[in-house]
């Protein structure tokens, strides 16, 4: 099994696309990239901990590749916006691919270069690619949010879905 960590704005919106893929064992919402151990949601939202909301994905590489996960990640985000994603603004919503080893870094960097060269976007691709840092699980009520709160999830992800339809489909 392997692990992937992606930050792409609100973690509620990053779970379902990965959970729907064959070879995914778990997708958990949490926080990473900051300087406070085991932060709470309230602390992260205060924008004082340095963390970003992210998802940790455990996957079977014999069924789905890390490269496939990176491609799916791009299609869930606006890679030209370094200051948040869609209606979620601020450093705690910044887009980051966190790599766990050198192979993942190379795959992510190559994929980013390919996306930039594709001409899909007029603006530069600004998503960061950084080494993985400690990943802290978010509170239980954030886990599987789209399943527990489908109406609130649909409302919170509407702007994202509109962008994805316009740019990725």
UniProtKB/Swiss-Prot annotation:
Keyword Oxidoreductase: yes
A Pfam family of this chain: PMSR
One BP term from GO: protein modification process
S-S bonds: none
Entry GO MF terms: L-methionine:thioredoxin-disulfide S-oxidoreductase activity; peptide-methionine (S)-S-oxide reductase activity
Its EC number(s): 1.8.4.11
Alphabetized Gene3D superfamilies for the sequence: Peptide methionine sulphoxide reductase MsrA (3.30.1060.10)
SUPFAM superfamilies: Peptide methionine sulfoxide reductase
Active site: 10
Segments passing through the bilayer: none
InterPro entries xrefs: Met_Sox_Rdtase_MsrA_dom, Met_Sox_Rdtase_MsrA_sf
Alphabetical keyword list: Oxidoreductase
HAMAP family per record: MsrA
Family as reported in the entry's similarity comment: Belongs to the MsrA Met sulfoxide reductase family.
Function: Has an important function as a repair enzyme for proteins that have been inactivated by oxidation. Catalyzes the reversible oxidation-reduction of methionine sulfoxide in proteins to methionine.
Protein's recorded name: Peptide methionine sulfoxide reductase MsrA
Gene label: msrA
């Amino acid at each position: 099994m392997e692990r992937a960590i992606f930050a792409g704005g609100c973690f509620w919106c990053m779970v379902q696309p990965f959970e729907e893929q064959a070879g995914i064992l778990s997708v958990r919402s949490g926080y990473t990239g900051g300087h406070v151990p085991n932060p709470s949601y309230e602390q992260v939202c205060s924008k004082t901990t340095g963390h970003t909301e992210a998802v940790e994905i455990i996957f079977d590489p014999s069924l789905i590749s890390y490269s496939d996960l990176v491609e799916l990640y791009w299609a869930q985000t606006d890679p030209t916006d370094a200051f948040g994603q869609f209606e979620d603004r601020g450093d705690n919503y910044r887009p980051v691919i966190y790599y766990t080893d050198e192979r993942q870094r190379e795959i992510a960097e190559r994929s980013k270069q390919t996306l930039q060269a594709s001409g899909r976007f007029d603006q530069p691709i600004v998503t960061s690619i950084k080494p993985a840092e400690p990943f802290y699980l978010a509170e239980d009520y954030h886990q599987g949010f789209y399943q527990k709160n489908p109406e609130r999830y649909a409302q919170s992800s509407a702007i994202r879905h509109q962008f994805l339809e316009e740019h990725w489909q």
